[in-house]
Amino acid sequence: MTSQPSLPADDFDIYHVLAECTDYYDTLPVKEADGNQPHFQGVTGLWNLGNTCCVNAISQCLCSILPLVEYFLTGKYITALQKFLLPSDCSEVATAFAYLMTDMWLGDSDCVSPEIFWSALGNLYPAFTKKMQQDAQEFLICVLNELHEALKKYHYSRRRSYEKGSTQRCCRKWITTETSIITQLFEEQLNYSIVCLKCEKCTYKNEVFTVFSLPIPSKYECSLRDCLQCFFQQDALTWNNEIHCSFCETKQETAVRASISKAPKIIIFHLKRFDIQGTTKRKLRTDIHYPLTNLDLTPYICSIFRKYPKYNLCAVVNHFGDLDGGHYTAFCKNSVTQA
């Protein structure tokens, strides 16, 4: 899902990018394919190389995200890769991904092969090269992690902090952060408030991630909002789930509540349909309803960071089958054709 406000299709200068790369200046970049059928750039199929539907579905969704496409088509990734003195596995993944995006947006074919990209990632994760069903969420996380590792830059900043003592003393510390096109687009941060139910002292913990996994609260039917409310409701951790309290200096029952302290430009939801409990595994077939536009995350934003984010749907990965086998497909909104 992409954040609003909803802007024209050329927000990320994609028409200018396509024009520079292909020398076409039509209102919509269209090529005549075989059979006199129009071929829209960015609307390109991927060959199934033998149970690679997971790879193809994720690639199609990433291909529909304009700022990511613009970053690779304009060659900005090359500058980021130049920090490597020697070729690395993650730089090969980034280069292969760039070639795939180029084929899908600037190529003449109705269908192209993802083999180079698939092989580059398979060198790092051999499990993905096996002729068996893979998990789309795991594949997506691996792709985003490798792209981030290849393209990241280091930023150094000085932040003010206070040391406890008889008198509080202000000091400045250097903070190192890593940023990339991946963190700029997809990174989200959750803030957990953890309250000890004995001393009632509160501590905070932050968690950063790119894929937001949501529980499914109903067996039959629910909405995406129901999934969000289930995730953000306050949880009581008791018995074997007690957390160590630094004030009581022992494990105590606690109340934990999460809120969003950094909302991403593009949010990725993973619906936890695969349920494994002990030796029992199953797929939840709950019907989940979600809005196409104006998904409002305001109720879940940390109050001091409130920015009223709203999101429009841009792509969905579907899975047909069960845990042992099935097929992945993708529905994507093309940012150029708006279809």
Curated annotation (Swiss-Prot):
Gene name, Swiss-Prot/TrEMBL: USP50
The scientific name of the source species is: Homo sapiens (Human)
A GO CC annotation recorded here is:
cytosol
E.C. designation(s): 3.4.19.12
Q: Which InterPro entries match?
A: Papain-like_cys_pep_sf, Peptidase_C19_UCH, Ub_carboxyl-term_hydrolase, USP_CS, USP_dom
Q: What is its main location?
A: cytoplasm
Protein name per Swiss-Prot or TrEMBL:
Ubiquitin carboxyl-terminal hydrolase 50
Ranges for the USP domain? Answer: 44-339
Report any Pfam family annotated for this entry: UCH
**EC top class named in words:** hydrolase
The GO terms this record gives for MF are: cysteine-type deubiquitinase activity; ubiquitin-like protein peptidase activity
Regarding tissue, the record states: Weakly expressed in a few tissues.
